[in-house]
């Protein structure tokens, strides 16, 4: 009987220890956030969500995602006209970025119904939201259209005013990313297609008046994203099938490219089995999250119909800072909890 009692007591302690361990694990998971689904988001209208940018909506107390909404599921569109004639979609998250719901098309006073809106970036400064939008006049079957970057402002992310077109390096500029430096200066990195699709730089003291500073990165790429994290400035550039190139700087002027790209190797998750493209980064506390898009149908085993080849999904992965480099593991669960942001 004594032996039986000791054995029973051991089992009891074992169960208690397992329960405590499970509680600790659950608490840690709760603190780091819930696991984001794969894919994180698909647009319910055109199924063509791409080029995401996230911003904290102070009035609503929720996170908003603005994104290029390509017309992926519209049949009979010739050439690349399905990526033209597009508007910017808006999705909303009330749980710190875990789940997203479609809200509306952004009402932007730029061009007409046949024109094209791409790849917005949004920053908040002194109570005003500033959007820098890529505008392409018209709808085109090829990539021949002009591109420019247009500045808009809003008090609430809903009602926008067109401030005007920026005077930059050429008539084929796109994909702005804007960041304020430690000294208060604003910088914009963007893609100039007239210069071999390399990344150029413009500078402003107030977000209103911009001076072009020429080429910032010599390598080809598009969709740059600039941010500050772990005492460095970072610039992530979409290099298509080669993944996302990562550049690091101490002054946001001289950039060193790390050897390995992000998201070049296809993942294993749903809609994530291809390389990742055109990303946004949200720094939340001491963590950073990479939001990117994929073309899930562009893999060897996928159907070759137009809709499957064209559709796109938004995904998220947490960035890590390891030995001075940025890394991420898209195959691991992404626990996410975006805090209310004072900087956006």
Language model segments and positions:
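Bacterial N-terminal signal peptides that target proteins for export
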Residues: 1-14
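Bacterial N-terminal signal peptides
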Residues: 12-23
């Amino acid at each position: 009987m004594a032996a039986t009692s000791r054995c029973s007591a051991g089992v009891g302690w074992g169960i208690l220890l397992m329960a405590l361990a499970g509680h600790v694990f659950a608490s840690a998971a709760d603190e780091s956030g819930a696991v984001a689904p794969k894919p994180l988001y698909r647009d319910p209208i055109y199924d063509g969500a791409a080029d995401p940018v996230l911003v904290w909506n102070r009035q609503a107390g929720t996170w908003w995602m603005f994104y290029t909404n390509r017309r992926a599921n519209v049949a009979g569109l010739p050439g690349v006209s399905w990526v033209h004639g597009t508007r910017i979609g808006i999705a909303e998250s009330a749980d710190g970025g875990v789940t997203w719901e479609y809200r509306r098309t952004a009402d932007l006073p730029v061009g007409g119904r046949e024109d094209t809106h791409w790849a917005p970036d949004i920053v908040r400064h002194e109570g005003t939201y500033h959007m820098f939008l890529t505008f392409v006049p018209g709808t085109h079957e090829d990539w021949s259209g002009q591109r420019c970057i247009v500045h808009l402002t809003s008090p609430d992310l809903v009602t926008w005013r067109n401030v005007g077109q920026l005077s930059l390096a050429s008539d084929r500029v796109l994909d702005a990313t804007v960041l304020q430096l430690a000294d208060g200066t604003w910088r914009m990195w963007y893609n100039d297609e007239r210069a071999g699709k390399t990344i150029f730089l413009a500078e402003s003291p107030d977000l209103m008046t911009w001076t072009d500073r020429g080429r910032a990165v010599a390598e080809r790429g598009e969709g740059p994203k600039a941010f500050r994290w772990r005492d460095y400035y970072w610039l992530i550039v979409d290099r298509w099938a080669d993944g996302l190139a990562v550049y690091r700087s101490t002054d946001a002027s001289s950039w060193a490219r790390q050897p390995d790209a992000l998201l070049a190797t296809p993942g294993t998750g749903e809609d994530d089995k291809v390389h990742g493209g055109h990303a946004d980064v949200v720094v939340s506390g001491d963590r950073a999250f990479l939001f990117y898009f994929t073309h899930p149908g562009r893999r060897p085993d996928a159907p070759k119909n137009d809709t499957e080849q064209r559709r796109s999904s938004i995904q998220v992965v947490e960035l890590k800072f390891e030995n001075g480099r940025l890394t991420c593991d898209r195959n691991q669960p992404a626990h996410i909890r975006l805090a209310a942001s004072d900087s956006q």
